[in-house]
Structure formats: structure tokens, C-alpha cells
Amino acid sequence: RQKLSYSNPIFIKLSPDESTETISLIMEEIRNYNFDGVISSNTTIDKTLLKDSDAQGLAGGLSGKPLYEKSNALLSDLHSLDPNILKIGVGGVFTQEDFAKKINLGASLVQIYTSFIYEGPQIVSKLLQ
């Protein structure tokens, strides 16, 4: 970062499909390279989270509600490994309870996307009421 004269925050988005051991090693590198924070999480390739077995063969990663529990588990692990690093909680946030859960698991910030697409801008006031 110093070589590039770059001062904006740098976050790394992690996969919820990585093992706890791999996440621990990644967190060591995040600290070594002075990343500003982590994002929990990217999409998952775990299609067993889908209720419709026909959809399990589809390509691509899962986001939204199917990602909620896995992203929360990763967020909890990240917070245990480093409670001081900034964490952005992502994945399956549709209700105030979902939002609060991310914060309670250690998220400094919460990102919404799928709920914004499906419910529109009013989701923001719904989450913050």
C-alpha cells in the first residue's frame, strides 16, 4: 500500500466454504499485510442449502437467504480470531433480526444486496426501524 501511495481502506471478501484452519491462516496474512477489514462472506457453492433438489445442479454461487447461516458462522469465526478487525457482515439480511444478528456476531458494518433487489429501497428503513 505504501509503495502505491494508496490510502483507501482495503477489505478482503472471504468464502464461507473454507475450512476453519484455512480461515485462520488467511487471517494471519490479513494482519501481516495490514488489511483494514474482512467481508463475511462471498457466495457459497454448497448447493445442499437449496430446498429444491432440481436447482442443486445449477452453476454459480448462492447468495441471499441460503447463505445466511454459513456467512454467520464465518463471521463468528472471524470475530473469535480477531475481535478488533473491521468486519462487514453480508448474506441473507432481510429482517431487523437478521441485521441485529450480524452486529451481535461482530460485524462493524452490514451489507445488503439481495433483499434490496427483491424489496427495493424501503428495505433500508425496514431494517433500521
Q: Which residues are covered by each model-predicted region?
A:
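Glycine-rich phosphate-binding active-site loops on the catalytic face of alpha/beta enzymes
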Residues: 37-45, 93, 99-126
